[in-house]
């Protein structure tokens, strides 16, 4: 008698995705981030659902409803901080996942990669809209500044911004629609994740060497289910350490002041996970140029597969590219630091240099390094 998991129409899908899936035998811990992102998404949807039960999306009561959640709801403080810091863990895993893709050449799976870029944009949009909801000072001014960037679009910009706001400033209409979108987007993300996995399972996983591993595959269960479970434990431990010991470590003190349209905070800055893009935006003195650079800082990921000039897929055996990739990581950390600093010298110059370096590494230096390494191979 054949096993029910191999014959049942629904269980068959689960079986082919999580149990009998042929997986390369040498994938490292860098391949754990996909499943960790799945866990983050589940945590965010569940905590978000419980927060939505007590939250009110009205400018007069939004701030006090969040206070009410933290003070009066059973374990409301825990749910709220799990959700807020869960977002930080989500982005840590996202950036690691994308970095892994760049380092090991996973971007050659074009469909998977492009769906991944769409997912990244969707998660960033969701995080931004969720950031506005508690209606504190930085939440409000962050929303005002970032949505206002769209006014840089020629001809239709101002109309577009007022259309998004639902008025002439960030107000009740904006808050209500942001709450609606923030609620629906995670489910769209979950659907996109399914498509992402569908395309991945068409080709199978890449591995650190970048060499096809068809001759050496092992079943996903039990080998990688247990490995993922270890990753889950590590992630949950980190998240709980953050939530239970310093829940406000990554937040902004300004957000404990209710939103006031008449009082601008001295330094407007987004959450830490957007600081690198914010630094790139600020390093260009022209508004439209800054907005284009901001969009390109993420959209550049779509160009990476076109610039893959190396004869090898992974960077595992390419020392020059390896150095460049780690310089890119250092550069992104520098940009993140600069994004949180006030706009004055020397930070302006450092930000501009780091921004130029960011685009140079991806567009010029990495393809050049690949060509040099190809030459070295011939010698």
UniProtKB/Swiss-Prot annotation:
Q: Where in the cell is it found?
A: Mitochondrion inner membrane
Where would you say this protein principally sits, based on its record? mitochondrion
Q: Identify the residues that bind heme b b562.
A: 83, 182
The alphabetical list of record keywords is: Electron transport, Heme, Iron, Membrane, Metal-binding, Mitochondrion, Mitochondrion inner membrane, Respiratory chain, Transmembrane, Transmembrane helix, Transport, Ubiquinone
What cofactor does its activity depend on?
A: heme b
User: What Gene Ontology biological process does one annotation of this record name?
Assistant: mitochondrial electron transport, ubiquinol to cytochrome c
Q: Which CDD domains match?
A: cytochrome_b_C, Cytochrome_b_N
Q: Which residues cross the membrane?
A: 33-53, 77-98, 113-133, 178-198, 226-246, 288-308, 320-340, 347-367
* Residues bound to a ubiquinone: 201
Gene Ontology MF: a single term: metal ion binding
Q: Which GO terms describe its cellular component?
A: mitochondrial inner membrane; respiratory chain complex III
What does the note accompanying the cofactor annotation read?
A: Binds 2 heme b groups non-covalently.
Q: Which InterPro entries match?
A: Cyt_b/b6_C, Cyt_b/b6_C_sf, Cyt_b/b6_N, Cytb/b6-like_sf, Cytochrome_b, Cytochrome_b_C_euk/bac, Cytochrome_b_N_euk/bac, Di-haem_cyt_TM
Entry similarity comment: Belongs to the cytochrome b family.
Q: How does it assemble?
A: The cytochrome bc1 complex contains 11 subunits: 3 respiratory subunits (MT-CYB, CYC1 and UQCRFS1), 2 core proteins (UQCRC1 and UQCRC2) and 6 low-molecular weight proteins (UQCRH/QCR6, UQCRB/QCR7, UQCRQ/QCR8, UQCR10/QCR9, UQCR11/QCR10 and a cleavage product of UQCRFS1). This cytochrome bc1 complex then forms a dimer.
- Further information: Heme 1 (or BL or b562) is low-potential and absorbs at about 562 nm, and heme 2 (or BH or b566) is high-potential and absorbs at about 566 nm.
Which PANTHER family would you find in this protein's record?
A: CYTOCHROME B (PTHR19271:SF16)
> Under what name is this protein listed?
Cytochrome b
Tell me the organism: Sylvilagus aquaticus
């Amino acid at each position: 008698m054949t096993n029910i998991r191999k014959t049942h129409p629904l269980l068959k899908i689960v079986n082919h995705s999580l149990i009998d899936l042929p997986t390369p035998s040498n994938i490292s811990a860098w391949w754990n981030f996909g499943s960790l992102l799945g866990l983050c998404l589940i945590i965010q949807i569940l905590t978000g659902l419980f927060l939505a039960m007590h939250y009110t999306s009205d400018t007069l009561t939004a701030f006090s409803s969040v206070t009410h959640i933290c003070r009066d709801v059973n374990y409301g403080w825990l749910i709220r901080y799990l959700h807020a810091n869960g977002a930080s863990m989500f982005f840590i895993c996202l950036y690691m996942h994308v970095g892994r893709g760049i380092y090991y050449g996973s971007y050659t799976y074009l469909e998977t990669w492009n769906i991944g870029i769409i997912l990244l944009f969707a998660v960033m949009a969701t995080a931004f809209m969720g950031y506005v909801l508690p209606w504190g000072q930085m939440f409000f001014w962050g929303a005002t500044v970032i949505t206002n960037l769209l006014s840089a679009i020629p001809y239709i910009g101002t109309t577009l911004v007022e259309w998004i706001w639902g008025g002439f400033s960030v107000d009740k209409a904006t808050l209500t629609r942001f709450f609606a979108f923030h609620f629906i987007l995670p489910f769209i993300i979950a659907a996109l994740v399914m498509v992402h996995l569908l395309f991945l399972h068409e080709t199978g996983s890449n591995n650190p060497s970048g060499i096809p591993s068809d001759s050496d595959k092992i079943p996903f269960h039990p080998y990688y289910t247990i490995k993922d479970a270890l990753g889950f434990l590590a992630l949950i431990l980190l998240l709980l350490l953050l939530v239970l010991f310093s829940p406000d470590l990554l937040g902004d003190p300004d957000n404990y002041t209710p939103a006031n349209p008449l009082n601008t905070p001295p330094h407007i800055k987004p959450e830490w996970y957007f600081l690198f893009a914010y630094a790139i935006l600020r390093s260009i003195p022209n508004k439209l140029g800054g907005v284009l650079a901001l969009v390109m800082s993420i959209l550049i990921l779509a160009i990476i597969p076109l610039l893959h000039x190396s004869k090898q897929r992974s960077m595992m055996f390419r020392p020059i590219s390896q150095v460049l990739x780690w310089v890119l990581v250092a550069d992104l950390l520098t940009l993140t630091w600069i994004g949180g600093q006030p706009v004055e010298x020397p930070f302006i110059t450092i930000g501009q240099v780091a921004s130029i370096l960011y685009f140079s590494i991806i567009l010029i230096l990495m393809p050049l390094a690949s060509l040099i390494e190809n030459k070295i191979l011939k010698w």
